[in-house]
Amino acid sequence: YAKLNESFSFNYRKNKVNFFSTLGFNSRKNFQDLNIQRKFIESSTKEVKSNFEQLSRIRDDGKSHNAKLGMDYFASKKTTLGVVFSGFYNPGKFGNHSDVMIYDPAMSLLSQTLASTSNDRKWKGFSTNLNLRHVFDSTGRELTVDVDYLTYRSKNSQDLINAYYDAHGLPTIKADTLLGSLPQDINIYTAKMDYTHPLN
């Protein structure tokens, strides 16, 4: 599959104000095909008891959208104020379809299991940063302040289905179905202040 990774940056300064922004987009698809064969052997006679074969087709499709917008205000030669907004949105899908066949030693089909797994995910986040930097003098004395707010939201839907059949393609037992929903909500608040005072 083709992959795409693009970004755009912009910076503009006039007088005491500096604006900057970045936009990014990423698209990717991956695949994996597996063909697994096993023989089960009787330890005492070394004869083949049964044969196992698994065919799996795995597909993963994901995208990423990123954006950042910020501004610096140079209040004076010693003091700078800033604000930054950033966010991302990453949707994606994953699928795994497997056929599992069990054969006798003569390679006659005994049973078959069809397994299907799908995952639909959406992950997004947003952050805000307020910052201040003040230089007291030329000796290196400096004060910096940062206040941040970050939020993350995730929705993850999962489906797992296993169906069981005999050698004639007739269901042997009821299919297993497992449905999952895994949401996440995260909020983070931080603040810090640093003061630098050189000793010499």
Regions found by a protein language model. Give the residues of each.
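Membrane-proximal, glycine/serine-rich, low-complexity loop/turn segments characteristic
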Residues: 1-97, 117-152, 189, 194-200
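Outer-membrane beta-barrel translocator domains and adjoining extracellular loop/strand segments
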Residues: 32-48, 94-109, 156-166, 170-172
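Generic signature of intrinsically disordered, low-complexity, basic-rich segments
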Residues: 75, 109-111
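Outer-membrane beta-barrel transmembrane domain signature of Gram-negative proteins
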Residues: 172-200
